């Protein structure tokens, strides 16, 4: 067409090398092995690339040649939005991203529903290794990760997988400390709101049989820590009501608290296995006209910013450092044959949502 301008194709590695009068290896080294070139020569190559529109080496071709993808995969058995909505997941993701960024690696999220059994996303992921974020022991996606010939690091759960590095906290010990705080205040009539315990969707009271089939070690260990602490003061675990929520949200905690307290109005304390659930329980208590902590003590676990603002008594854990440690462990593994297990510290943070029950003196006197 008359008067139309021609669209110039971007330069290629070969055309850029010809333009500069250097070898194609020299151009490639400017991107992939900069230490092989003098600083002036590398800058000359990069300046010409910018001027001629050369985008750099094709990452697909490079990965085929080097057999490295330059990316870490994060297996998340939740919807993708969960990673940006849940504050614990967000903090972990930030820490992992910082580790990848420092190492010049990309980060690929591999989100799959906990009720989804198709593992093809795991096999399609072009990554050099996986960080597995808190999945159940028999999760098919985790089993698919283990079949891939790449290093793997687990965050939180499952624990004790042969040959696999792990980063986590001692959930049982942490919850034992919280339980002792409550029993020290005089609480004996305690109820629990917990996160998902198994793959099968369930919302409501947790039976004794379901407690023996818990597939998520973190929840199993947090409940065990509470059981240990209550046993120290003679509380029969069989009499402790536990309410489960499959979905993890403030709304889930709110509805669980409504059901739990309707069934057991005698409770003086509600222990939630996450801050998110505890914030929901706080909302319900307020709507019900209960004073927290005078009428009802409520506690959480995680130490998320919103819980801190609410003055929640909780167990704080270093979620950002978890992510950073998991990333560094994966990226620094090298030829190390023995797995490393890193246990990070937790801290009991007593806020404004726990105090002695009004009838504490009666319990202490044994009446």
Spell out what each predicted region is.
Residues 1-11, 26, 71-184, 367:
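Alpha-helical recognition/docking segments in bacterial nutrient-uptake
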Residues 1-68, 366-367:
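N-terminal helix-turn-helix DNA-binding module of bacterial transcription factors
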Residues 13, 254, 258-367:
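Flexible loop/turn connectors
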Residues 17, 132, 272-273:
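Short beta-strand scaffold positions
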Residues 18, 65, 123, 183-186:
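Non-catalytic positions within long, well-ordered alpha-helices that form the structural scaffold/packing
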Residues 23, 70, 128, 187-189, ...:
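Short acidic/polar active-site loop segments enriched in Thr and Asp
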Residues 78-91, 112-117, 167-177, 192-231, ...:
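Hinge/beta->alpha junction and helix N-cap segments in small-molecule ligand-binding domains
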Residues 188-189, 237-240, 291-297:
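Short acidic capping loops at alpha-helix termini that bridge into adjacent secondary structure
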């Amino acid at each position: 067409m008359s008067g139309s301008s021609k669209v110039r194709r971007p330069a290629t590695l070969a055309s850029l090398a010809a333009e500069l009068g250097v070898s194609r290896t020299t151009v490639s080294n400017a991107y992939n092995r900069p230490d092989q070139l003098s600083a002036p020569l590398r800058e000359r190559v990069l300046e010409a690339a910018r001027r001629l529109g050369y985008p750099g080496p094709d990452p697909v071709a490079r990965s085929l040649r080097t057999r490295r993808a330059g990316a870490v995969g994060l297996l998340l058995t939740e919807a993708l939005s969960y990673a940006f909505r849940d504050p614990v997941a967000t903090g972990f993701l930030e820490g992992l991203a910082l580790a990848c960024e420092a190492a010049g690696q990309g980060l690929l999220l591999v989100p799959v529903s906990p009720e989804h059994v198709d593992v093809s996303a795991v096999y399609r992921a072009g990554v050099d290794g996986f960080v597995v974020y808190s999945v159940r022991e028999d999760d098919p996606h985790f089993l698919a990760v283990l079949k891939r010939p790449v290093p793997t690091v687990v965050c939180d759960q499952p624990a004790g997988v042969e040959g696999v590095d792990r980063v986590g906290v001692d959930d049982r010990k942490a919850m034992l400390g919280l339980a002792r705080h409550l029993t020290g205040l005089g609480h004996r009539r305690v109820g629990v709101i917990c996160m998902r315990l198994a793959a099968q969707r369930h919302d409501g009271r947790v039976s004794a049989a379901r407690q023996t089939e818990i597939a998520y070690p973190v929840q199993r260990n947090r409940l065990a820590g509470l059981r240990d602490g209550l046993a120290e003061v003679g509380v029969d675990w069989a009499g402790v009501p536990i309410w489960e929520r499959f979905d993890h949200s403030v709304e889930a905690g709110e509805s669980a608290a409504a059901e739990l307290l309707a069934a057991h109005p005698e409770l003086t304390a509600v222990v939630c296995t996450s801050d998110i659930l505890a914030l929901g329980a706080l909302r319900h208590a307020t709507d019900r006209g209960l004073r927290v902590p005078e009428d009802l003590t409520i506690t959480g676990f995680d130490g998320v910013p919103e819980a801190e603002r609410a003055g929640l008594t909780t167990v704080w854990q270093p979620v950002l450092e978890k992510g950073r440690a998991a990333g560094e462990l994966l990226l620094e593994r090298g030829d190390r044959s023995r797995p490393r297990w890193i246990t990070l510290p937790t801290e009991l943070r007593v806020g404004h949502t726990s105090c002695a029950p009004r009838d504490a003196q009666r319990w202490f006197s044994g009446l």
